[in-house]
Every structure is written in structure tokens, then in C-alpha cells.
Regions:
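Conserved beta-strand-loop-alpha-helix junction that forms the acyl-donor binding cleft
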Residues: 110-121, 139-143
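Short coil/turn segments at alpha/beta junctions that flank glycine-rich nucleotide-binding fingerprints
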Residues: 70, 86, 103-106
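Short hydrophobic/aromatic beta-strand or adjacent loop that forms the aromatic wall/cage
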Residues: 47, 143-148
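Conserved GNAT acetyl-CoA-binding A-motif
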Residues: 100-113
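Generic structural signal for conserved hydrophobic packing positions in ordered secondary structure
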Residues: 18, 74, 108-110, 118, ...
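Acetyl-CoA-dependent GNAT
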Residues: 2-75, 80, 93-94, 99, ...
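Conserved acetyl-CoA-binding loop-helix of GNAT-fold acetyltransferases
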Residues: 79, 85-98, 123-127
Length: 153
């Protein structure tokens, strides 16, 4: 049975998954355009991260950063390689959307890439109602970056 828990980032499995996430973000992004948070940034008070577990195995993680009292940003969405195509990302994004609503956010945003490596993420966000729009949160627009938003209220 899968379960989602708020993560304190002290476990070996979450550390390994986040290191993989960072490495692939830098591999699949032009220099200077990988904006994945490292584990120290994910510990900041404006960020909450959750992990999804399948028994004792880490299946994925996702974080929510507060940009303003009414605006959140999705960060560090990652499915563990052994759990791809099992609905992990769908469960995590549904959790983030619900949490954003409980926090009173009116808008949820994210930044992602545009190369083939990001196609599954782009499809996931579109399937949950995110629409492409303007840059936000201090990001610099480029041919690589794409920005998506979901109105919650």
C-alpha cells in the first residue's frame, strides 16, 4: 500500500533520490538553467517536501514552496526509477494540489524544461489542468524554460 508522508530529509533513500534528481536536472538542462533545489534548500522553512512510499521502498517525492500567502510553487517532483509508470507522480501532484488548496493558495505554479527528457512531466502537468504562462518567482525566461500555472480559486 502506498502512503504519502511529510519527509524530514534524513533518510538514505530520499537523499539518493534527490541526488539523482539534481544530477539529471543538470544533465538535461543547459548550463545555468537547472533550478532543482538541493537538499539544503529543501530544508528551508518556506518549503515542505513529501515522500511517497510503497511499503519500505521510496517511490517518489514532491515539494511545495510558498512564494506568497496565496501562491505556491511545485519543486522536486521525482519518481524513483523502479516506480515509473505506476501512478506515483499522479498521486504526488494530486497531494500537492490538495495541500495548496488547504493552505489557501489561489495559484500553483512550476518551472520545467522543454527538451524530450521533460515530456512526461509536461504531459502530467497538462493532464492536471496546468496551463503554460508567464515567468514568475524571479526565473529568467529562455528558450528552454517553460512556466505553468493552475488557478485554485
Amino acid at each position: 500500500m502506498m502512503r504519502i508522508v511529510e519527509d524530514d530529509l534524513t533518510g538514505d533513500q530520499i537523499g539518493a533520490l534527490l541526488r539523482l534528481h539534481m544530477a539529471e536536472a543538470h544533465t538535461n538542462s543547459p548550463a545555468g538553467l537547472a533550478f532543482a533545489f538541493d537538499i539544503d534548500r529543501l530544508r528551508a522553512p518556506d518549503v515542505t517536501i513529501w515522500s511517497l512510499w510503497d511499503g519500505d521502498a521510496l517511490a517518489g517525492c514532491a515539494a511545495l514552496k510558498e512564494l506568497a500567502p496565496d501562491h505556491g510553487e511545485i519543486k522536486s517532483m521525482r519518481t524513483a526509477p523502479d516506480h515509473l509508470r505506476k501512478g506515483v507522480a499522479k498521486r504526488l501532484i494530486a497531494h500537492l494540489i490538495a495541500e495548496a488548496g488547504q493552505r489557501g493558495y489561489q495559484r500553483l505554479s512550476l518551472e520545467t524544461g522543454s527538451t524530450p527528457a521533460y515530456r512526461p512531466a509536461l504531459a502530467l502537468y497538462a493532464s492536471h489542468g496546468f496551463v503554460e504562462g508567464e515567468q514568475f518567482g524571479g526565473y529568467v525566461a529562455s528558450d528552454f524554460n517553460r512556466f505553468f500555472h493552475l488557478a485554485l480559486a
